[in-house]
């Protein structure tokens, strides 16, 4: 994991919004969470790492999808990713994981290869629905939390984390030709594509980023009740640990927003990171939340 938001797909070294079988996860669920994580991280690697052509990346993801389908059908998968699909097959069987959530993740990775602009917020949130929200829904499935209100709160948290990661990573994504800032919001702030591609830091671009960051923070807060629900569902110390971990994840995202604000929303040229002091702040805020 990098020093960004700890634990939505966005570069294999930056795969975020995912608690990777940490010490706070209920021990019985750590193998399942690790299997899901490695499935997602490996797919992210195929989509975003190295110097393969877009066509080669898409071909690899198609082969990976075929292995997932074989895995879900309890059939033999290829040797190439046996280390991913053997444990995942056991987890799917043991926990009855919804396969559509795993295929949604793959479709988002595929989209990241072919799509570099988003017309409006609705289009961006549709991407988040497949790139980030499945992570939360898979975890809730493992926790036995299935009610619609909790799923919606999880979606809000995961989408917010993905959006925060986008606004944190503008200095990385824009030079690669990826602009996640919705086109429909540019004109309202007097921004055009030329300014963004030139990574021009001026009042217009920083106001645009600020508006997007504030929106992500508001979305995050829609999930504020979910940690309590998870803790109540699991019960006991395991419930407290899972709820506390979720509060830490949320506070990590909000802390990144604070750090984006602290550099005056200049993330077109500067990427804020969390440090040890931030970790202490996150821990304390999560305890009080």
Give the predicted meaning of each segment.
Residues 1-161, 167-289:
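Catalytic cores of Mg2+-dependent Asp-rich isoprenoid enzymes
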